[in-house]
Amino acid sequence: MSEYMKNEILEFLNRHNGGKTAEIAEALAVTDYQARYYLLLLEKAGMVQRSPLRRGMATYWFLKGEKQAGQSCSSTT
């Protein structure tokens, strides 16, 4: 993967606290398929993670370790 594309995707996810595949593709001026390819490589490298896969739902990507939108904190005391 090109360092440029890797850095652009990571920067986008950092600035926007995540995003959908289509949003990332549009921001980087690439096709949805190209964006998905790079995102899957970053996921495999452990740098990003995605929302759980559900049929018919958009995939939401975010930096590894970031709290997913709508996820609550649970504490054990």
From Swiss-Prot:
The keyword Lipoprotein is assigned to this record:
no
Give GO BP annotations, semicolon-separated: regulation of DNA-templated transcription
| Source species, domain of life | Bacteria
The record's InterPro entries line, in alphabetical order, gives:
FaeA, WH-like_DNA-bd_sf, WH_DNA-bd_sf
Q: Name one Pfam family in it.
A: FaeA
The keyword Transcription regulation is assigned to this record = yes
Q: Which UniProt keywords apply?
A: Activator, Fimbrium biogenesis, Transcription, Transcription regulation
Instruction: Tell me the Gene3D superfamilies matching this sequence.
Output: Winged helix-like DNA-binding domain superfamily/Winged helix DNA-binding domain (1.10.10.10)
Instruction: Read off the SUPFAM superfamilies from this record.
Output: Winged helix' DNA-binding domain
Could you tell me what this protein is called? P fimbrial regulatory protein KS71A
Q: Which organism is it from?
A: Escherichia coli
State the gene name recorded for this protein. KS71A
